[in-house]
């Protein structure tokens, strides 16, 4: 890879981070029903169009195409791109948006890209923190979608994030509880996933000793 290609790759990585965080901010702000919701959706379109370009660019220049799809990070990008294309086709043919909940589900798929941030840092403590943050964040987004409008205690993203965090960390104050079966399942699987991750980390640490 020559100097020009390395510079382009670096620029792509920086833009990828910027657009990923745009999606994160967009989702959080959307839970407060802002008057600029349409603007957020337009910004999301720009971000996801960049992700689509980035995915095609990476796939085009990789030598081993089969190995490309064995990488979990590329699979995440593929899911995001396919979901975006399907949603765009639906909007084009129906001439109308499908609703904020569908848009937020698409945003959550994009949030899976947070997982890729772990590649940027080799510090194990920071990797563990980013992993936990990713689990809590995505679970919070799902909780907000299924519980908002049903659960009077969950009115915005912060309420959902607070509830998810204390549930996953098993603190569980009990001041906020899920009201829907979907919400309960999300918390159950999130806690089980978190605990299984702790067990795996402990097993690796013991083997290392």
From Swiss-Prot:
Record-linked InterPro entries: Hyp-activated_K+_channel, Ion_trans_dom, VG_K_chnl, Volt_channel_dom_sf
Topology relative to the membrane: Multi-pass membrane protein
Subcellular localization: Cell membrane
Transmembrane segments: 11-31, 39-59, 72-92, 97-117, 126-146, 182-202
Chain ranges on the Cytoplasmic side, renumbered to this chain: 1-10, 60-71, 118-125, 203-209
Extracellular side of membrane: 32-38, 93-96, 147-181
Chaperone keyword on record: no
SUPFAM superfamilies reported for this sequence: Voltage-gated potassium channels
Entry's family note: Belongs to the potassium channel family.
Subunit architecture: Homotetramer.
Entry function: Voltage-gated potassium-selective channel opened by hyperpolarization.
Miscellaneous comment as given in the Swiss-Prot or TrEMBL entry: Inhibited by barium.
Protein name: Hyperpolarization-activated voltage-gated potassium channel
Organism annotation: Methanocaldococcus jannaschii (strain ATCC 43067 / DSM 2661 / JAL-1 / JCM 10045 / NBRC 100440)
């Amino acid at each position: 890879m020559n100097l020009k290609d390395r510079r382009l790759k670096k620029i792509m990585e920086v833009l990828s981070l910027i657009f990923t965080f745009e999606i994160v901010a967009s989702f959080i702000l959307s839970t407060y029903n802002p008057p600029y919701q349409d603007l957020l959706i337009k910004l999301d379109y720009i971000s996801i169009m960049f992700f689509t370009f980035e995915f095609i660019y990476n796939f085009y220049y990789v030598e081993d195409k089969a190995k490309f799809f064995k990488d979990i990070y590329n699979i995440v990008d593929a899911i995001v791109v396919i979901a975006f294309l399907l949603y765009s086709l639906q909007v084009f043919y129906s001439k109308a948006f499908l609703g904020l909940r569908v848009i937020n589900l698409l945003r959550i798929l994009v949030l899976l890209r947070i997982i890729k941030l772990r590649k940027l840092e080799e510090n194990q403590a920071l990797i563990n923190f980013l992993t936990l943050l990713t689990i809590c964040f995505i679970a919070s987004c799902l909780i907000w979608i299924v519980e908002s409008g049903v659960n009077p205690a969950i009115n915005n993203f912060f309420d959902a994030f607070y509830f998810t965090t204390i549930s996953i960390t098993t603190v569980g104050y009990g001041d906020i509880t899920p009201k829907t079966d979907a919400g309960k399942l999300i918390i159950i699987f999130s806690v089980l996933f978190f605990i299984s991750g702790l067990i795996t980390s402990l097993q690796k640490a013991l083997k290392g000793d």
